[in-house]
Every structure is written in structure tokens, then in C-alpha cells.
């Protein structure tokens, strides 16, 4: 039997774009979670993470880029969503809390 306590997934909004407008609760959650997951563009940009970095020191955190396909093909979408879910689940199963930034 697996005795590892599962991590918790936290959905965290970084607000409208200005780090100074992030809520205190969002900042506190990001500070406390060892893993930060955020959508990443095909060009490699992680806007939600960039905004969070303006309010929180993320050094020492595990950064988990999530790739969500921009496609109308439902199979492509399902595959990209499953890959993102699997990546997050691996950390949760290892007992690490994850903040999903958006």
C-alpha cells in the first residue's frame, strides 16, 4: 500500500496582468507550493508565470510548463490535455502541492 500523502492542486489566478493586483491569497499559495504549473505558448512564453514572478520569488520552485494545443481537432486536444494532466498528477502523486497558474 502506498503511504505517500497526495499533494493538493490549487487553481491560482494571477489577475488581470499587473503583479500588484494579485490577491494576498494567490501570493501566499504560490509561495507555499513547491510546484508551479502554467500554460506555455508554442514560442515558450509562460505569461501567468511571468506575472507571478513580479510578486513572488519563484527561485527554488519546480516550474512545470503545460502545453495546450490550439486545435479544433478533438483528438489533438484530448492528447494535449491528457499530457498536461499526467504531468501535474505525477507531482501530486509524489506528495507535492501544485499551484496551477492562470
Enumerate the language-model features and the residues they cover.
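Class I S-adenosyl-L-methionine
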Residues: 1-19, 24-102
Amino acid at each position: 500500500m502506498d503511504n505517500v500523502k497526495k499533494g493538493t492542486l490549487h487553481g491560482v489566478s494571477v489577475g488581470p496582468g499587473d503583479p500588484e493586483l494579485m490577491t494576498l491569497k494567490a501570493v501566499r499559495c504560490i509561495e507555499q507550493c513547491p510546484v508551479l504549473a502554467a500554460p506555455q505558448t508554442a514560442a515558450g512564453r509562460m505569461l501567468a508565470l511571468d506575472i507571478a514572478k513580479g510578486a513572488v520569488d519563484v527561485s527554488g520552485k519546480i516550474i512545470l510548463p503545460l502545453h495546450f494545443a490550439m486545435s479544433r481537432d478533438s483528438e489533438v486536444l484530448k492528447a494535449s490535455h491528457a499530457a498536461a494532466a499526467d504531468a501535474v498528477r505525477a507531482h501530486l502523486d509524489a506528495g507535492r502541492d501544485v499551484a496551477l497558474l492562470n
